[in-house]
Amino acid sequence: MDAKTDDKAGKCPVAHGPAPRGNRDWWPEQLNLSMLHQRSPSADPLGKDFHYAEQFKTLDLKALKQDLTALMTESQDWWPADFGHYGGLFIRMAWHSAGTYRTTDGRGGAGAGQQRFAPLNSWPDNANLDKARRLLWPIKQKYGQKISWADLYVLAGNVALESMGFQTFGFAGGRADTWEPEELFWGPEGTWLGDERYSGERQLADPLGAVQMGLIYVNPEGPNGNPDPLGSAKDIRETFARMAMNDEETVALIAGGHTFGKTHGAGDPSLLGPEPEGGDVEDQGLGWKSKYGTGFGADAITGGPEVIWSQEPTKWSNHFFDNLFKFEWELTKSPAGAQQWVAKNAEPSVPDPFDPSKKRLPTMLTSDLALRFDPIYEKISRRFYENPDEFADAFARAWFKLTHRDMGPVARYLGPEVPKETLLWQDPIPPVDHELINDADVEALKAKILGSGLSVADLVSTAWNSASTFRGSDKRGGANGARIRLAPQKDWEVNQPEQLATVLQKLEAIGKEFGKKVSLADLIVLGGVAAIEKAAKDAGVAVKVPFSPGRMDASQEQTDAPSFAPLEPRADGFRNYINSKKHQFMKPEEALVDRAQLLTLTAPEMTVLVGGLRVLGANAGDSKHGVFTTKPGTLSNDFFVNLLTMATSWQPSGTEGIYEGRDRKSGEVKWTATRVDLIFGSHSQLRALAEVYAQADSKEKFVNDFVAAWTKVMNADRFDLIAEPVLLEAAE
């Protein structure tokens, strides 16, 4: 609800000072692999034997909520509660924890508790949320590892709402904490509140959702501080859509959130001290120390506006809409100099946060007035105004979606307050309703699949396309559900719709003819298993690829097609694919690393998968780029051997992004390649990995490592399985 909109706008968010120059300083264009090694076990103080879900199951949630409810009205002298209630502060904390989520790549959100780390803990829009986290510390300290910070942020927001008379939709635990900042692209700007992310007619760059560096959503004063409600509505619609909210959900969230609390702009924002990451050691991670008055309470400065929306800011009500429509609004400025709106011809009716004897005039933000003056938002707002119960239900559902959107399927939800109702945005999959196939069935089905006339490339590419939609960021996608046969995935260019239809038709026929029920989702993955075992055997290595049945097939009615559109790859370096119809905002090799990170792969896993998929002939469109073998369909290490040989000289071809590998002696073209292929020979770290697999004694290691990485991708969305290392079993 609060936001900094004009103070310190030119300050660089990167700390400066004498420091040794690293590789990125010398070679800024060097491909960065560090995102593949985030969440390292070595950074986790709890160790590999700690399982958060098991700890959460021992939590006394009722007692925890009672403690949180008591905290809401236990005002502290070092940061007094507005209106004697911390509800508005904790709603904002939870909202801003979840509100970084973006649909384009599924990153951000509340799932990892990243708000306590840089840069989020120091974003202008998160000013003074450090105080909310410190207020929570005694409770976190009391309950220890039974509740993660990530879960506690969301739960505190829920309890805040409930303590002020609102009935929430539910709460699910299960967000395990991370222990270091995630390396994530938040924008190209080098200053807080910069907006270089726009081009043309205010076209917001992908994958970003917020309008300016350091904001969660939009500038509350209007686009770039311009108090234009209609312009603000355009920004709101764009940025809320990018975090998976439609118009109705957007109105419900803004109006519902702004039913409570206030913004803080009591004085000159230039009197604020540095953000937490910019403070001195004695500040102990508390930022934004203010020299204005007492620095807190009635003198608090969080951002520019000083707005109170409701006559009862610690109680669920319809006052927001009542004020929005009852009054005409006049542009004014806050004590901090920010643009905001005050009710015309009104009597003071909203309470002062610290002096019960005082009343103020109702006030609104430019982004609030967008809900009245945008014709689409106005229609929804008026309906909610006239139907308070409908508004309450819409806000409850939208709040639940906001705070749970990046948790993935309901199978990951924990606790007694998980809603019984299944929601479409949760990507529901039917429960297993049949006896699963056994080992003998698996072998029989593999034989039938290999005898169906489908090639190794057909089976591998179909299984890969089905499973590789998985995003570890928001736990969406994956092979479970077999949504590759449904709209929109069945029509994606990368999936080669005609070939896909043929493969699926044959697999479905095999399933129908088999004596036991088996899902198409399982058959798709099993087809890949059978193909890889055959390809490895043809390379002289006997291996049994792990397979775990238990996937089910989702229906089209269980699939929100528009919400799956962002999962369509702009590029898939694993299959040497670039979608020419989509804007590419990364180099091909950067897109490969980005996709590998979403698949939760390490650099070695990414390397071995690319090398294996190339020789298996799994390229999109049957492209020959990077197929450095004379035996396609055989799981050999030829890709690495032929890439690293000095017998080949590489040079650009006449086609952009395509390279020719010529025999150094004859000049004959032997291979063609993309940037994704050649990066494994040009990048020193990737070359070191490629060398491992090109060595003469790595024949079996290559196959085993490929199978392990492949199985990891196939099972990425199997939250019903216990996460254990993939153990390879030699075939008989």
Swiss-Prot record:
Domain of life: Bacteria
Posttranslational modification: Formation of the three residue Trp-Tyr-Met cross-link is important for the catalase, but not the peroxidase activity of the enzyme.
A biological process term (GO) from this entry: cellular response to hydrogen peroxide
Positions contributing to heme b binding: 258
Active site: 96 (proton acceptor)
Basic and acidic residues composition bias: residue spans: 1-10
Its job: Bifunctional enzyme with both catalase and broad-spectrum peroxidase activity.
The protein's name: Catalase-peroxidase
Gene: katG
